[in-house]
Structures are given as C-alpha cells and as structure tokens.
Amino acid sequence: MKNEPKITPELVAAHGLKPDEYERILKLIGREPTFTELGIFSAMWNEHCSYKSSRIHLRGLPTKAPWVIQGPGENAGVIDIGDGQAVVFKMESHNHPSYIEPYQGATTGVGGILRDVFTMGARPIACLNALSFGAPEHAKTRHLVSGVVAGVGGYGNSFGVPTVGGQVRFHTRYDGNILVNAMAVGLADADKIFYAAASGVNMPIVYLGSKTGRDGIHGASMASAEFDDKSEEKRPTVQVGDPFAEKLLLEACLEIMEKGCVIAIQDMGAAGLTCSAVEMGAKGDLGVDLDLDAVPTRETGMSAYEMMLSESQERMLMVLKPEKEKEAEAIFKKWGLDFAVVGYTTPSKRFVVKHGGDVMADLPIKELGDEAPLYDRPHVPSAALPVVHAREVMAPMGVGSALEKLIGTPDMCSKRWVWEQYDHVILGNTMQRPGGDAAVVRVQDGPKGLALTVDVTPRYCEADPFEGGKQAVAEAWRNITAVGGKPLAITDNLNFGNPERPEIMGQFVGCLKGISEACRTLDFPVVSGNVSLYNETNGRAILPTPSIGGVGLLDDFTKSASLAFKAEGEAILLIGETHGWLGQSVYLRDICGREEGAPPPVDLAAEKRNGDCVRGMIHAGTATAVHDLSDGGLLIALAEMAMASGIGAKLLAAPTSLVSQAYWFGEDQARYLVTVPETEAGRVLAKMRGCEVPCVRIGTTGGDAIAIAGEAPVTIDKLRTSFERWLPEYMGGKAA
C-alpha cells in the first residue's frame, strides 16, 4: 500500500508497542495492520494518550461538587462561579520536548494548554507554570533555564495572556529530565461550553488553523518513553509554535462559536489529527471518514502516516452544522486561516483514513481508545523514614546568619529574573502580581476575582508519597486562602518516573491517595489534569512531582489580602501549631547539608479549621497582611513580608520548649502569619481561642530589620540583597 514498510517486530518495538500489545491489535482487527494503522495504534495506545498505567488509580480522585460543570475527560475542567460565568482551566506537561529543545518545547507547551481552554469556548485570562530544573552546577541547567523561560514568555506575551504565577526549583534529580508544567485559565458563559463529542451522521468534519508539516511526528510517543544518551536525536519530534497564528485561531474559534456553527470541537494536540478525530467520533458513538487529500499541508509529498501523526501546532478539528459551513468558512478566511472539510461522521463506528484514493486505515473507532491496554502495575510503598529530632541537629550558625544564607539559595531566592520576562499585567486584570501566595485576577465587568496558584513539594513526595500528596493540595488550598479566596477546584499534573518499576509506581499510588484524601477533606475536587510518566534518564528518575494548580473565588477582589506588612506597630500573629519539624526542611538540606527524614505530617482537619478562620479575618477586614508558611518556615515567611513592605519586625524569642532553629525554620503545616492593628490583637486572640484555633502573638511590625530578642538583627536591605542576587548572577554566567 503506497510502498509502506513491512511490519516487523523491530518496527513494532520502535513504535513503543510491547509484543503482547501487538498481539492484542492482531486479535482486535483480525489481520496485520498497515504501517499507517500501526502508527495510529502507537499514538492512541501510548502512555501519553491512553493513561494505561494510571487510569485505574485516577478513578479514585474526587471529581464532583455542586459547582463542577465538567470534570476530567474533556479538554479542560469547568467550574461555575455564579452570575452565569464559568472558569475553564487545566495544567499539562511538555517535559521531554523542553529538555531537547527548551525554547520550542516551552512555547508549544503554553500554546497547547491555551488551546485546551479556548476549545471549550473560554477566553484565556491567565497562565501559570511550574518549572523544575537540574542542579545549578549541571552543564545544561543554565541553557535550559534560559530557553524555557524565554519560550514561556515569548509565547504568552505574543499571544496576549498574562503569566501571573508559578514555581521554579532546582534539584540534581532533574539534571537529565526537566519539568515544564503549564496551566491556563479562561472565562466562559456557563451555558455556552463546547465539547468534543460529535453528533449526527454525515456531518462535515473541518480542519482549521495552520497547515500540517512534519514537525512533532511521534511527539506523544516520545513523551511516553524514558530518555537515554541518544535523546538529542529526538529533536525533530519537537513541535514549533506560532503564537500569532494561535491568537488568530482563538478569535476565529470564539467567533464561530458565538455564531452557533459548532457541534463539536477538539484541538489537535498529542498525536495530532489521529487523536482528535478518534476522540470526537468515539465520544459521540460515531464513525469517522477522513480524506487526507483535503488536509492543508506546508510540505510536499507527506504520507498518510506523517499527516496522521504530525503534531504541528495551532490546529483544530470541528464538526460543523452543515447549514453553517459557508458562514464558518468565511470567518476563518477573514482571519487568514486554513479551512478545509476533511471528512464526515458516519454510523459505522469505524475510523477510515483515505489518501490518494487508497484506504490507508480502517479500524474500529471505540476500541482505539476504549480497548487500550489497562495495567494494574505492581507497586511497592516507599519505606517510612525516621523522624528527625530537632535536639539532635547541630546548628552550624546563628539564626540570623542562617536566615541570610537560606533566603539567597537557589530554591528560596527571588525568581524576579524569571517573572519579569513574562508580561504579567497584559489585559489589565492582574490585581496581585507574581511573588505572593497566589495571583489574583479580576473577573472583568464585576467585583469578582480569581485566586490562582501552582504548588508541590517534591522532596516531601519522595520521602513520604502519601503525606507529600496531601501537602501539595493543602499548600494550594492555603495559598488561595491567604489572599482571601474560597478554594473551589484543582487541576493536577502528575510527573513521575518509569511506572514499570514497582518503587516508582508505589510513589504514584501513594501520592494519588494523598491527593484524593486532601481533596475530599477540603472539598477541593479535581476537574482536569495530566499524567507524565517515564521522566527519567538512564534509569535515574525525577523526584515525584505531582503539581497542583488551584483555583479559588473572591466575591470582591478589592478585599483580597497580600503578604506585605502594611504599617508599623501592628501585632504579628502566628496561626497554627508549631512543633519545630525539621525533617525534609530546606534548613536541614541547605544549612545543615542533610536531605533526610520524614516530612511534616498534614492534619487536614487543622488545615480546614485554621484556613477558614484566616479567610474569615480577611473578609471581616481584620487582617492587614497574610502569608502562609511553607518552605523555610516561620522566619523565611516573616522576611518575605518585611521585604515586600520595607517594614521590619521585632520578634519575641523562641519558646524555651522548642529548639530555636526548629522554631524559626521548621516546616510544620497548616500555619499562617497574620498582622492585625494593635487595637484588635486581644480580641482576635480571644476569638481564636474560642474557635480552638492555635494562635499566638510573636511580635510587632516596625523598624528596618528582623530583630529577634537575644539575636543580632538582620536588616531588610541585607536580606533583600541576598534574596535578589543569586539568580541574576547565575544566569549572567557566574559559577553556581
């Protein structure tokens, strides 16, 4: 058939299919597949598209709530925020491409997640990201940071959506496999959400957007395999993005949606035309006939195999109402985009692909997705690590010196160098910029605001996957709460190593159980997400990194809280219990040189109780500044509040019942720092006692330094110098 290669065991293996999976294909279709069919099965049955190793565990996630309009299974999740408005959001990874070609990998990661959001009928209003890089001293790290940050900024800035928050971390376990997790958030009318399921027989299937090229072929398969020393050879499988074409595609899609032309819509992401066409047909219980001669291409002589597996960017597939076809075509031509009828829906439940008059593929459409192998892989739980007792930890330096050093380390230092390359205020609705607990974005034409955050602590997840999974969700919940938002829902991006290794699968299962428990207890459902496995190189896996993207609602964005101290002479209150937990803390790692111990346990009932009280204080107007406590503990949080305002703090000494370093740098969970006017302090403390919420006064705002009783003060200027210095110097070429 058109000189297609002969199917051999080597060719099957090169497509990422195991021998038993190929036998399953033979049984399913009753014959040997064509080369194009082999490519289609490879695309639909790989880990990236089929979730074959994770699906049985994902079923345990809580996904429903009265405000959830659409949970997992569509292009993005959708939640109701009242007044006929909905928030559409999702996070997904572009890890493997970004390691091979950092600029293009990052740009197309942003482009892909934006398409997922506007495919649902939403106008994107914000992006966030979570970036994990190797050790600063690794030979490729500086190059990868530079390329990824430029790519994220280049696409978002050109497309015209603000990048409002995220995370950046460094760890040697990401040396050979960085993580680029991108999140997009959009607004839509709650009664005008668009879905992927086709309906009606003989409806036109229309190709929209940019032309198809050879870029990105096998991109989804690459994302389903671990790296080795030849990973650089996969550079041709990295897609190339064009943010200006995507902006045109956005406007054209929203316009034809508004005109009532669309029956179903699916963006061409992983596995391109194959996955989008199969999903539209299978979800609608229909067949699909495609004629590849009609596909707009930008390269000559493309084969059916290449066209079906290309991951060229900025493309959509739609099922249109036949009577609206001409109107839709005129809209796309107006925006300068390709519009081509490439097929029709059929009652056959077959996926038929024709090219040059030949049938290149004829497969059962439901089985391509629904009959993908499903694995319950062996998994072993991670061994419990011993608790690190604070009294057994030698303090190598004083508290002030430790603060000054810690706040200038790669993970704790300012990421201004990163976020200043992103346009975080375009559209004019960013009310709280990067650097705080959560971004706050105004919902246009009203008082409402959205609180947005991305969180995970991978070292906790490695040490105890269950507690680490809980903590990732709790941290997102706290960050939203700290700005005054009511947490509504999350999207997750689950990044792990090779699931065929029982210890890695054990990490995945443990983290997922923790995420599920936290989401259930906090009433914080999962509405969308992405699983990225095989994140390892030469057998060395990344730290388990289940990134959590959280969305919350503020009824009035003008009443949000921020972390900056507001005035001198205000009372500083610590809410939540402090035990001085040093296991897996950044203090223990970066000051004491010990990356060890059990992570802090997460008491979800305390998280809910403490957080609800803090949110109540914000809404009542009592709290003047709020900051949640996480990496680095109490003193790092205090320093961040002081640097944000230029106002210092006069602090009481650590309680004698606790080791000083553990009190100041321990990472106990469910805690917040809150400032209140001096006149309110007594009343607030009494109210907290009545609510059984642990709350103590630890000091007073004022001066130009962090001054702890009995310790040498550290000036804000000194802290700010340390905080701001490392990343610009590192990226400027100074040694790590």
From Swiss-Prot:
Mg(2+) 1 binds at E92, N530. Its EC number is 6.3.5.3. Substrate binds at S93, H94, N95, H96, R115, Q239, E311, S312, Q313, S532. Its main location: cytoplasm. It holds the Pfam family AIRS. One of its GO terms (molecular function) is phosphoribosylformylglycinamidine synthase activity. GO terms for cellular component: cytoplasm. Transmembrane segments: none annotated. It is an enzyme of class 6 (ligase). GO terms for biological process: 'de novo' IMP biosynthetic process; purine nucleotide biosynthetic process. Pathway: Purine metabolism; IMP biosynthesis via de novo pathway; 5-amino-1-(5-phospho-D-ribosyl)imidazole from N(2)-formyl-N(1)-(5-phospho-D-ribosyl)glycinamide: step 1/2. The active site is at H48, H94. InterPro entries: PRibForGlyAmidine_synth_PurL (IPR010074), PurL_linker (IPR041609), PurM-like_C_dom (IPR010918), PurM-like_C_sf (IPR036676), PurM-like_N (IPR016188), PurM-like_N_sf (IPR036921). It is found in: Cytoplasm. ATP binds at Y51, K90, D492, G529. Keywords: ATP-binding, Cytoplasm, Ligase, Magnesium, Metal-binding, Nucleotide-binding, Purine biosynthesis. It comes from the Bacteria. Mg(2+) 2 binds at D116, D267. Gene3D superfamilies: PurM-like C-terminal domain, PurM-like, N-terminal domain. It catalyses: N(2)-formyl-N(1)-(5-phospho-beta-D-ribosyl)glycinamide + L-glutamine + ATP + H2O = 2-formamido-N(1)-(5-O-phospho-beta-D-ribosyl)acetamidine + L-glutamate + ADP + phosphate + H(+). Part of the phosphoribosylformylglycinamidine synthase complex involved in the purines biosynthetic pathway. Catalyzes the ATP-dependent conversion of formylglycinamide ribonucleotide (FGAR) and glutamine to yield formylglycinamidine ribonucleotide (FGAM) and glutamate. The FGAM synthase complex is composed of three subunits. PurQ produces an ammonia molecule by converting glutamine to glutamate. PurL transfers the ammonia molecule to FGAR to form FGAM in an ATP-dependent manner. Monomer. Part of the FGAM synthase complex composed of 1 PurL, 1 PurQ and 2 PurS subunits. Belongs to the FGAMS family. This is Phosphoribosylformylglycinamidine synthase subunit PurL. It comes from Bradyrhizobium diazoefficiens (strain JCM 10833 / BCRC 13528 / IAM 13628 / NBRC 14792 / USDA 110). The lineage of its organism: Bacteria, Pseudomonadati, Pseudomonadota, Alphaproteobacteria, Hyphomicrobiales.
